[in-house]
Design a protein with these regions (language model features):
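Acidic, metal/ion-coordinating pockets
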Residues: 2-366
Length: 366
């Protein structure tokens, strides 16, 4: 058994143990007078949890993670688990949790000639694993901030923590690899690409370390079609768009639709540092950007507001839900009450092709 499989096996055991408990609760409900859709919170008072059937696969997605600056200061004071203390129950309850790592995890390399360069403590790889993450997207504009060695170090530290790095590798084959994970008889394919890179030198080559590029998307669409033949669900995790803009760029909409047309069931974006619309297109979901997640404070408060996207695959049906959070001192804290209602209303207003309900559920617009 590989290290990744070992971690998924342990996580599956925990999910099954919880699912048998859930089945018992539902059985009691039947005896009381009828089957209900039970929404409860098993681990925290601040978030909605769907108690699921044994054949249902649940996923959680977050936006940008980086552990530098004021975030690093808080980690030094409070430990590596600090950024995830409030959201760990949400991540851990998912069968598969995915995040975008917007930093290198290394102690070496020279800063590249760019405005912002991020280098974080390699111990944060294990902190992410301990918090519930399973896959980590590396195709973005920061994972080579300190050169090729910093990227390879980042991959090494993630793998040591039994996390699966996506969208990067020592060559193009590794960077564009489709990652398949099977849960409860369902095979899910994950692909990770970036449409935002500082230089073509960051693109992986036949014999060159680098990232999976979406600038020429034909190869990406081909990979999606390949994944479609081998998986029950195809997910594209993509870095794209314009910073601090709630409206997607025209190319995002075009590319998102073409990804679905090629076979993607779910497209999840990041890079804008701010939440962008959610959209149902041909029965498939596109979340254009999940914004920041673990990040330094922004002067623009909308950049400090984020959400975990929860997705459930039940048969061939996809259900989706947003769990809002507010980034305070570098740590996402779950929203409640009026703040949560206001945030979800905002996402609903900027999403003309979806309806976001007061409980965070995302459904097609009437």
């Amino acid at each position: 058994m590989s290290k990744g499989e070992e971690k998924h096996s342990m996580k599956t055991y925990r999910k099954y143990r919880f699912a048998w408990l859930a089945a018992g609760i539902l059985a009691l409900g039947l005896l009381a007078g009828g089957l209900m859709n039970v929404i409860a919170d098993a681990k925290t008072k601040n978030a909605d949890v769907m108690i699921t059937s044994l054949d249902r696969v649940t996923l959680a997605f977050t936006g940008d993670l980086q552990f530098t600056g004021t975030v690093a200061e808080q980690i030094k004071k409070n430990g590596t688990s600090y950024p995830f203390t409030d959201v760990k129950p949400i991540l851990a309850r998912a069968d598969i949790a995915v995040g975008n790592l917007e930093t290198t995890l290394t102690t070496r390399g020279a800063a590249q000639n760019k405005q912002f360069t991020f280098r974080s403590d390699p111990r944060m790889a294990q902190a992410m694993a301990d918090s519930g993450y399973d896959l980590v997207g590396l195709a973005n504009n920061h994972t080579m901030d300190f050169g090729q060695d910093s990227l390879l170090d980042t991959i090494k530290h993630l793998q040591k923590a039994k996390l699966i790095p996506m969208g990067a590798g020592k060559n193009l084959t590794e960077a564009t690899q489709i990652h398949y994970i099977t849960k409860r008889g369902k095979t899910i394919a994950f692909l990770n690409y970036s449409r935002v890179l500082p230089s073509t030198s960051w693109m992986a080559g036949a014999n060159k370390p680098g990232l999976a590029s979406a600038y020429n998307p034909k190869g990406m669409y081909s990979k999606v079609r390949e994944a479609r033949k081998n998986a029950d669900m195809v997910i594209v995790f993509i870095h794209w768009g314009k910073e601090r803009m709630t409206v997607p760029e025209a190319y995002q909409t075009e590319m998102g639709h073409k990804l679905v047309d090629a076979g993607a069931d779910l497209v999840v974006g990041h890079h804008s540092h701010i939440m962008q619309p959610v959209e149902w297109y041909k029965g498939k979901l596109i979340a254009y950007s999940l914004g920041n997640f673990v990040f330094t404070k922004s002067k623009m408060d909308l950049c400090n507001q984020t959400a975990i996207l929860e997705v459930a695959l039940n048969g061939k049906r996809i259900q989706a839900n947003l769990v809002p959070a507010h980034i305070i001192n570098g740590r996402p804290r779950l929203m409640t009450g009026a703040e949560k209602a206001s945030f979800l209303n905002f996402i609903d207003r900027i999403s003309p092709k979806a309806t976001v309900k007061s409980d965070g559920t995302i459904v097609p617009s009437p």
